[in-house]
Amino acid sequence: MKYAHAPFVGGHRVSARASILVVLALLAFAFVPTTRAVPPPDADPFYAASVDLGTHPAGAVLRTRSIALYGLPLPVSAWQVQYRTNDANGLPIAGMTTVLAPNWPWFGPGQRPLLSYQIAEDSLGSRCAPSYALRGGWDLGGANTYIDTPFIAEALRRGWAVVTSDYEGPESRFLDGVNAGRAVLDGIRAARALAPDGVGPASPVGGWGYSGGAFATLWAAQMQSEYAPDVQFAGVTAGGIPADWPAMVHGVDGGTQAGLAMLALTAIAKNEPNSGVLELLNERGRSNFAEDVNACGPDFVVKYINAHVDDFAAVPDVLSHPDFRAATDRQELGGGAPVTPMYLYHSTTDNVIPVAGFTDLLGRYCAQGADITSVHSTLPGHNPTAVGEAAGAMGFLADRFAGVPVAPGCHGR
């Protein structure tokens, strides 16, 4: 890829092409299988919730362990942290997060920044959890974690500490915005309580996620002022943003990414048994639901290549059925605007998430007074944009961590 002009980041010219090459080079380290036996979360007592879970405040650290980090070729310390959070119904659940900190001093201003990075978990089973993959649990279900590892590595290389939570929770609730947002915010609280080297109460906090990770990031940002006023973001970046779920699932239905439509349908039926969505499936659909109820996103993609969702439904055009639409409406972003500066980006030719939903979300956020730098990227497609626009996202965060002021209001780039 060629760029006529390199962007300015923090007052310095940065080559976007060079940043892409660095990310791709780091990516090579993330795909070497480990020989260590790592038990999956369901077989690991460390993940089990304690009986006194409800006596702890949200964000409280329940237990920690140092781990050997998998796939990051940098001198860093890493911990798995179990913490108390709340599900969408306000009930206490045991969250799990991975906290990473560089093994060298922070030389920037103030305390070491803390980046909350949300991996696109996109799954229905605990073996798909980022914490399992980052510890070396080699499973196809962790593919998104392995793909996102280079972005985490670049944050660490810059000297930032990173917290990345299993924001779907112990029940692996994909497509549950409130559940995800609370888990992210409480994961940040837990990371600050752990206080890895250089991280303290005054550490600036940032949020970043792409695709499914953007969904969790923005739900957390929307909920922050009400749910966690003590967690104030210096800035948030998000790209490939899931907005307009019906358009998304219709767009991939029948194609190579049809499994994502089946993932969304299965998640709604699993998360909301009273929604009526399960009753919309035919016998074949119910049989597959039973098979897939704990599957990972990559499992769905492989299994349902070129499938049509209506082949598994008892009603025509199930993705437009009022029961399904009502359930997905509850998961749409934009009900409230984050109070932190944001850098939001999306490919105009995104082949997974149509750009129209992104443009509409920008309009809703801006109408509510948000401060946004937006990018309608000309990079082709969903995955290339994740890499190609990473330099701009990280530059925005670096400026916010350095205290560089941002122009108020909404601005396109």
Descriptions of predicted regions:
Residues 110-122, 129-132:
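Short beta-strand element of the alpha/beta-hydrolase
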Residues 344-350:
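Short beta-strand/loop motif that positions the catalytic acidic residue
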Residues 372-386:
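Histidine-bearing beta->alpha loop at or near hydrolase active sites
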